[in-house]
Amino acid sequence: MIKATYSSAKDFYSLLSGLLKVTDEIILNFTEDSIFSRYLTDDKVLMVIFKIPKEYLEDYTIDKPLGIKININDLKKILGKAKSKSATVTLEETEAGLKVTVRDEKTGTRSNIYIKGEKTSIDQLTEPKVNLSVTFTTDGDVLKDIARDLSLVGEEVEISADENTVTLSTEEAGRTYKSLLKQDKPLKSLNVESPSKAVYSIEVLKDVFKVTSISQNVTVGFGNNIPMKIEVPTDSGGQLIFWIAPRL
């Protein structure tokens, strides 16, 4: 049997909401090291990964690795009630799927819901193995605003980097938009192993960057014409990871 408690029901809700931008059904994989879910869109343009490492889980019990296929909206029904930062969420395996309990540690109030789920083996999707020659970190709201502005002008964005600047630009029908990101303006960190350039869909980028607003320390990595990696951590240890395929 499986039982896991996560310290922030509110963050759990935010992470699941990020997954819901891509799919409404996921396989929650329970392993010795973590709880995670991976999903690849049919067109193979976008992969999203939800992950909570074992060290951020309380009272984690697992007899054997297991996947449980569930509908995210079923989970959100109860997690949406978790307005307090002190609310925890507990997942327990049942014969039919999962029992989900949200408990407010301050008030002692508790809500339960039973979710039907199909038990499966651990999914075998793997992340791209690429060398990200450029990485930078910034507030998620910064990326959300940039994506919104890009979408007003074009359909694809060129992102490039040199020693001290990351540039995101688009041009269409005589209109141009360009954003220059530098260390401390507004980047919190910037590492450029070599000058790099790639082109991505603005529509996909906009959907992903909407989710980044849940974090103040989003890390973006890319290289020459390779998938972009976007890491969105939460204060409670859970995270979302997105991979976006380039336009070639």
Curated annotation (Swiss-Prot):
InterPro entries associated with the record: DNA_clamp_sf, Pr_cel_nuc_antig, Pr_cel_nuc_antig_C, Pr_cel_nuc_antig_N
Family the entry assigns: Belongs to the PCNA family.
Gene3D superfamilies: 3.70.10.10
Protein name per its UniProtKB record: DNA polymerase sliding clamp 2
One protein family per Pfam: PCNA_N
Gene Ontology biological process terms, A to Z: leading strand elongation; regulation of DNA replication
Purpose of the protein: Sliding clamp subunit that acts as a moving platform for DNA processing. Responsible for tethering the catalytic subunit of DNA polymerase and other proteins to DNA during high-speed replication. Both trimeric complexes inhibit DNA ligase and both 3'-5' and 5'-3' activity of Hel308 (Hjm) helicase, but stimulate Hjc, the Holliday junction cleavage enzyme.
Record-level Gene Ontology MF annotations: DNA binding; DNA polymerase processivity factor activity
Gene name of the record: pcn2
Source organism of the structure: Sulfurisphaera tokodaii (strain DSM 16993 / JCM 10545 / NBRC 100140 / 7) (Sulfolobus tokodaii)
Subunit text: The subunits circularize to form a toroid; DNA passes through its center. Replication factor C (RFC) is required to load the toroid on the DNA. Forms a dimeric complex with PCNA3 and trimeric complexes PCNA123 and PCNA323; does not form homotrimers. Crystal structures show a heterotetramer of 2 PCNA2 and 2 PCNA3, which would be large enough to clamp a Holliday junction.
Disulfide-bond pairs as recorded: none
Keywords annotated in UniProt: DNA replication, DNA-binding
